[in-house]
Swiss-Prot record:
KW Nucleus (keyword) present: yes
Coiled-coil regions, chain positions: none
Keywords: Cytoplasm, DNA damage, DNA repair, Meiosis, Nucleus
Family: Belongs to the CSM2 family.
Organism listed in the record: Candida glabrata (strain ATCC 2001 / BCRC 20586 / JCM 3761 / NBRC 0622 / NRRL Y-65 / CBS 138) (Yeast)
Protein name: Chromosome segregation in meiosis protein 2
Described purpose of this protein according to its UniProt entry: Involved in chromosome segregation during meiosis. Promotes efficient recombinational repair and functions in the protection of the genome from spontaneous and induced DNA damage like mutations and gross chromosomal rearrangements (GCRs).
Keyword DNA-binding: no
GO BP term (any one): maintenance of rDNA
Cellular component terms (Gene Ontology): cytoplasm; nucleus; Shu complex; site of double-strand break
Amino acid sequence: MPPKRYDDLSLLTLWPVAPDIDLAQYIYQFLTSEVGTQTEKEVYFTDSINSFPIHQLQELVNESNQSIYENIKINTALDLHELSSIIKKNTESLILKKIQNKKTNDLKPFQILSVINGLDVMFRSTLVSFTNEQAHLMLRDVMLRLRQVCNEYDCSPLTFKIILLFNRSDVMELLPKQRHSAAHQQKKMKYNNAMEGNSVGEFVGKYYCDEVAQ
């Protein structure tokens, strides 16, 4: 699991996906920590498979903090093109927040946690309409955009950090002392040409992420 404190979280972290309750608890803890301070928080959740753990989160939220739902923005991206559009929209929102902060001289900390799930599914959907090479270039472009926005907003008062969720079976090469199953090897072979021998998760983890949460 990634570090619980937002300040300890790397700019771009890969998290081998845990049970929904773990993700719900992580989001809840992020949004409810530092209550009573001036820190504002938002969660951007983007996925391709409607995987937001709403029921698990509802079990954690009580009547006194129902307002946290207002700080969660959920988007669906079926392929890399749609994900790129969402990243562009989020970036424009960050620029506006930055401009507003300068105009009002508002130095209150504003922390944004972006969670992206199903990047491998988006890549496969992109392969339906594009060649391996084109899909690979689109994936690189998406990851460079994410890397850029993290680097741009890496210090207070406005900070932006990203967690990428993948199945453990998709990132076995990044985990210590893991035995690779036959299914994992077949999956690697399937996308060998596009991912230089790696699964999507392994490619992203090796070349773009700061940390792989264990």
